[in-house]
Swiss-Prot record:
This is 23S rRNA (guanine(748)-N(1))-methyltransferase. Disulfide bonds: none annotated. GO terms for molecular function: 23S rRNA (guanine(748)-N(1))-methyltransferase activity; metal ion binding. Specifically methylates the guanosine in position 748 of 23S rRNA. Confers resistance to the macrolide antibiotic tylosine.
């Protein structure tokens, strides 16, 4: 956990500012949080029963992202973040539900002085994210709960294929800050719904996003990316294993279905990037 990031944090129990002392974060009311040797810190306010990504899911996602298959998405995200920031480069970028830190690391390359903080409920993901970039820090946090950040701490927030809590994101963003949300389109990975039992993207996802954000944010821009991925059998397995569909899959049956597909299978990547500003 970088000391430059600690100044943006607050205690999840009492909301007092957190300070760094040796390998411990503490607030004035005596709440303490040890920094793990891998560099992340657990800032959960209370235990959660929500399912977080497992070690296997995180490993599959890391392998797929590192392979470059999702590079069109990551590069478009970085470019959109750069354009949204304009002349005022952010000093603090928060990735909410950011997983392994792959996307945050690329965005940080656009802003040479920015500090990055990734929040996720998955400890295996946060552990990886702590070393995703020299200016990235990470913490275990429930993104549905009160976020462990001070009011107006962040200049930019990322939310890529992840849950979001609009009132809390609004609170932690400064006036004039940027929220960048990436959501799947109806045809995203559609070729794998029947072939491999992938969960289907729900109808009217964009409309629900707009309704969810409306009381707290104004959408000021939107871009779409649609491209074709050419995935081998290993990559197909990782696509399934890294997401919620993996909870419902029998590994042997999945392997059998993948083996029946062509050696290189064309799959649609289709997403929307929505740029938002907090409402007064």
């Amino acid at each position: 956990m970088r000391k430059n990031v600690v100044r943006y944090l607050r205690c999840p129990h009492c909301a007092a500012p957190l300070r760094s002392s040796d390998r411990t974060l503490r607030c004035e009311n005596g709440h303490t949080f040890d920094v793990a040797r891998q560099g992340y810190v657990n800032l959960l306010r209370r235990p959660t029963k929500l399912a977080a990504d497992t070690t296997d899911m995180v490993a599959a996602r890391a392998a797929l992202l590192d392979s470059g298959h999702y590079a069109p998405l990551t590069e478009r995200l970085a470019g959109t973040a750069r354009r949204a920031a304009g002349a005022g480069a952010p000093d603090c970028v928060v990735d909410i539900g950011g997983g392994t830190g792959h996307h945050l690391a690329r965005v940080l390359e656009e802003f040479e002085d920015a500090e990055g903080l990734l929040l996720d409920m998955s400890k295996p993901a946060v552990r990886r994210a702590a070393r995703a970039h020299p200016r990235a820090s990470s913490a275990v946090a429930d993104v549905w709960d009160t976020l462990p950040l001070r009011d107006g701490a962040a200049a930019m927030a990322l939310n890529v294929f992840a849950p979001r809590n609009p009132p809390e994101i609004r609170r932690i963003l400064r006036p004039g800050g940027t929220l960048l949300v990436v959501t799947p389109q109806q045809d995203h990975l559609a070729e794998l719904v029947d072939a491999l039992g992938l969960l289907r993207v729900r109808d009217h996802k964009e409309g629900r996003l707009a309704e969810q954000l409306a009381p707290h944010f104004e959408a000021v821009g939107q871009e779409r990316l649609r491209t074709t991925l050419r995935l081998d059998h290993d990559a197909l397995g990782r696509v399934v294993a890294m997401g919620p569909s993996s909870w419902h899959q029998d590994p042997d049956e999945l392997a059998r279905r993948i083996a029946e597909l062509p050696g290189i299978h064309e799959v649609t990547l289709s997403v929307t990037f929505t740029v938002c500003r907090p409402l007064p």
